[in-house]
Amino acid sequence: LTSERVQFAIESAILAEGGRSDDTIVAGGDQACDPHERGHGPLRSRELIIIDIFPRVLKTGYFGDMTRTYLRGRANEAQRQLRQAVFNAQQAAIKSVKAGVEGSHVHQQVLDVFDLGGYETTRGKNGSTGFFHGTGHGLGLDIHETPRVSGLVSAPLKKGTVVTIEPGLYYPGLGGCRIEDVVQVTARGAKLLSDHHYDWEIR
């Protein structure tokens, strides 16, 4: 099984449903430690595999965006803890989404969970490890729209806005993990628009 075969299967299925998805990410092992790496070559058992799809509905022009992390076989304890930390961070961020809340506040929920779990972030000339990207972005007729959900740009989330929530952790040797869903901002909280389970170990 290769990244290319899975990418082809995903993009063919999306096309059959009236969508188009280019540059689908299916990255395993250390390839998954680069959030923008599409992935290539064999998908090995017992390695974390990030699958990120962002299809566009041809009839309306609107984008979707969703990421899940999988593993073929049984995860080791370090992989299990990493995945649980990312899931917990994502759920904490989603729970904090509400009209009027700053995007930086949502981002901080992710940082707090990772800090509590001892997941450090380092940045260097040869790459970064840990959590080194924003928590999310607006989504609509473009794949990346305002507002940004990050610590760099802070603005209140507006009612009706659609945003992604996609924290991740990346450590070469251990692998990468990212979980992403799309939510709509409401006056009472976040309305989950994604509809896919969180099962991740494929046995």
What residue ranges belong to the model's regions?
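Active-site neighborhoods and metal-handling regions in enzymes and metal-associated proteins
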Residues: 1-203
